[in-house]
Regions:
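Conserved phosphate-binding catalytic cores of ATP/NTP-utilizing and phosphoryl-transfer enzymes
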Residues: 1, 132-161, 327-339
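Phosphate-binding glycine-rich/basic clefts of nucleotide- and phosphate-handling proteins
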Residues: 173-258
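Active-site neighborhood for divalent-cation/phosphate handling
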Residues: 84-146
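Conserved phosphate-binding loops in N-terminal lobes of ATP-dependent enzymes
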Residues: 12-14, 22-108, 235-239, 272, ...
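Helical "lid/coupling" subdomains associated with nucleotide-phosphate turnover
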Residues: 237-360
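Phosphate/pyrophosphate-binding loops at sites that engage ATP/ADP/AMP, CoA/4′-phosphopantetheine
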Residues: 92-105, 206-217, 272-291
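Gly/Thr-rich phosphate-binding beta-strand-loop-beta motif of the actin/hexokinase/Hsp70
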Residues: 1-28, 32, 147-181, 198, ...
């Protein structure tokens, strides 16, 4: 029997599949698919790669739509108008074509989604023909991976980051079953906030050097955002980065160093440190032998992993690669398939109800 795990956050969707009962995937790269979730709404609905396109506005692109599942919020105008439910269906149809249609499917979903939104995602998947077994929070999937790798702790602080926000979750794993004990989402620390902060920092350097604001013209502003995004994605690979801004009759180059990055993000880090300490103090009753499970994209924010480790001195930690998290989706799907109805409640609702607290953040 084939089983599949699908991991979704506000920026991307990923799937991985294999044979039930196997602990490892034989060909993980062949069975793994990933797509950015951003749709062009110009002439026809079509997918785009690269989240810099999100700067074009909600009338031209549909992006960061996952938090708005089950809502009437619209993107686009006229015939190209769409809602989050339809946008997600577009990507699930695309993924469904890449996995065996008889596969049993489970989802790993962000903490901020409510049970109602989770059920809606499962309904959309069932509508297109997927055999949905249930869902877990991606924090639970992270915790399962962390405990499996460390073998030292059953308590886990899972930290995730996407376009909507930064999520903190306290998960306890007992006899292989994850229990979400506490969680909080901080929209003010979403990935786009860090990218915009860096873009503004570079723009201010341009004003200081040549008295020209690159944010005034849309094309230059888009180029600025794109380079800031690329810089964030490669933040740990170099000690400095070159940024080039060009317009007709004007060009400027800058070198951004690690010292610049520290200065740029100091305010965000100070605010995050306060929130992190407050969460740990009030939501985690015991800090003995707790394990940190850090989502892969936290590495795109310089110093964030160090901050989390320093604030949990003595804790072991593991930073998950994308494949780790998606492999956990596969394990969850495998477990659900083999456990059968044990994972379902009396009315057939998904297993997410057993683990999820109604914690979701306000989507103002």
């Amino acid at each position: 029997m084939n089983v599949a795990g699908i991991y979704i956050d506000s920026l991307s969707v990923h799937s991985i599949w294999g044979v039930a009962g196997g602990n490892r995937l034989v060909n993980p790269h062949e069975n793994y698919k990933s797509r950015d979730m951003i749709l062009s709404l110009d002439d026809k609905v079509s997918p785009l790669q690269g989240h810099s396109f999100s700067r074009q506005g909600s009338h031209k692109v549909c992006s960061n739509f996952l938090p708005w599942i089950c809502s009437n919020k619209t993107w686009g105008l006229g015939k190209s108008e769409t809602i989050a439910d339809h946008a997600l269906e577009f990507y699930l149809v695309d993924l469904f074509a890449q996995i065996p249609h008889e596969a049993k499917v489970a989802f790993s979903l962000p903490l901020y989604l409510t049970p109602k939104q989770t059920r809606r995602i499962e309904q959309i998947a069932s509508k297109i023909g997927m055999q949905v077994q249930g869902s877990l929070t991606s924090a639970s999937a992270l915790a399962l991976g962390a405990i499996r790798k460390s073998q030292t702790s059953s308590n886990c602080l899972a930290v995730e980051l996407d376009g909507f926000g930064l999520s903190l979750s306290h998960v306890q794993v007992a006899e292989g079953v994850p229990h979400l004990l506490a969680g909080k989402v901080f929209p003010e620390f979403g990935l786009h906030r860090w990218v915009l902060k860096l873009a503004d920092f570079i723009a201010e350097k341009a004003i200081l050097h040549c008295r020209k604001d690159p944010r005034v013209k849309p094309d230059t502003d888009q180029a600025l955002f794109l380079q800031a995004q690329k810089l964030m994605a490669n933040i740990g690979t170099k000690v400095s980065f070159k940024v080039v801004l060009e317009e007709e009759f004007w060009s400027q180059e800058f070198v951004i160093t690690q010292t610049d990055l520290k200065k740029c993000f100091s305010g965000l880090f100070s605010a995050l440190k306060l929130q992190l300490n407050d969460f740990i103090q009030h939501k985690i009753t015991t800090r003995d032998d707790i394990h940190l499970a850090l989502a892969h994209n936290l590495g795109g924010v310089p110093g964030l992993t160090s901050l989390l480790v320093q604030d949990n001195s003595g804790a072991s930690y593991h930073t998950h690669s994308p494949e780790d998290l998606f492999h956990q989706s596969f394990i969850c799907s495998n477990a659900m398939t083999m456990a059968g109805q044990w994972w379902l409640d009396s009315v057939g609702a998904s297993s997410v109800v057993q683990y999820r607290n109604p914690i979701g953040a306000s989507k103002v």
